[in-house]
Amino acid sequence: MQIFVKTLTGKTITLEVEGSDNIENVKAKIQDKEGIPPDQQRLIFAGKQLEDGRTLSDYNIQKESTLHLVLRLRGGMQIFVKTLTGKTITLEVEGSDNIENVKAKIQDKEGIPPDQQRLIFAGKQLEDGRTLSDYNIQKESTLHLVLRLRGGMQIFVKTLTGKTITLEVEGSDNIENVKAKIQDKEGIPPDQQRLIFAGKQLEDGRTLSDYNIQKESTLHLVLRLRGGMQIFVKTLTGKTITLEVEGSDNIENVKAKIQDKEGIPPDQQRLIFAGKQLEDGRTLSDYNIQKESTLHLVLRLRGGN
């Protein structure tokens, strides 16, 4: 049967083969036609590198199938580059290649400009002027590719378990966008996420710039447990504050949340519900405060009763 072999230069070679031919035989035929030694040939079909001892039939290669020929440079090696989408790119490199070269190869394969690429290995960001050998990157090492958005920046999100997530964002991203990025990375639904920065809970409709969140700022992620609820707190000025709470939260917790939002110290807060002043040690459930209940906040003046 006839099969085709396409090179990286775009040239297509036609070969006469049998299904029972092994990959070594095919490489020998390519050497006959093109003069490329078998040990410099890598053949790819359906995204898989073909092994010398296997046959065309083993890989279900049939008539008029197209194989791709990649040259293995003398002294060269293969490395892998994994993107945030989970895609893995295979590159042919030399230990002496610098990081700029590697980014150029990624651009050739994926069309991503080098100035938008950040490469990470063993937790370190790789610098353009250094070589793969400088970082002890060896054959079949995996690098991680993070895209640097134009005008974008990196921020960190720390969870209660101590894990830190790195996100690529823009100052103009709103908090909903950030929660969506966290969902993409961690699988946590946005409605279960509460993001805290500088002691304040971030509101969905506001942007990172609104909160003066800059590059390498750290946000804190608190999970809103299912079974949580929203309540409202109305001040004497008529302002209404929305709080995320649990029925098991005690009144002290609620006052702390109000302090986070409004900056009012707990000892200056008096909370009223259904005509009763709420006591610190009791819980919302004790007072039968349910979702969307409204509490009234009265300020206790310093020195007052």
Curated annotation (Swiss-Prot):
Example GO BP: modification-dependent protein catabolic process
Main location: cytoplasm
Crosslink position(s): Glycyl lysine isopeptide (Gly-Lys) (interchain with K-? in acceptor proteins): G76
Keyword Protein biosynthesis recorded: no
Location(s) in or outside the cell: Cytoplasm; Nucleus
Pfam families named among the record's database cross-references: ubiquitin
Residue span, Ubiquitin-like domain: 1-76, 77-152, 153-228, 229-304
Propeptide: 305
Record-linked SMART domains: UBQ
Protein keywords: Cytoplasm, Isopeptide bond, Nucleus, Repeat, Ubl conjugation
Molecular function terms, GO-annotated: protein tag activity; ubiquitin protein ligase binding
InterPro entries xrefs: Ubiquitin-like_dom, Ubiquitin-like_domsf, Ubiquitin_CS, Ubiquitin_dom, Ubiquitin_ubiquitin-like
Example of a GO cellular component annotation carried by this entry: nucleus
Further comment: Ubiquitin is synthesized as a polyubiquitin precursor with exact head to tail repeats. Some ubiquitin genes contain a single copy of ubiquitin fused to a ribosomal protein. In D.discoideum there are 9 genes: ubqA: 5 copies of Ub and a final Asn; ubqB: 1 copy of Ub and ribosomal protein eL40; ubqC: 1 copy of Ub and ribosomal protein eS31; ubqD: 3 copies of Ub and a final Leu; ubqF: 7 copies of Ub and a final Asn; ubqG: 5 copies of Ub and a final Leu; ubqH: 5 copies of Ub and a final Asn; ubqI: 4 copies of Ub and a final Asn; ubqJ: 4 copies of Ub and a final Asn.
Family: Belongs to the ubiquitin family.
Name under which the protein is recorded: Polyubiquitin-I
Organism of provenance: Dictyostelium discoideum
Recorded name of the encoding gene: ubqI
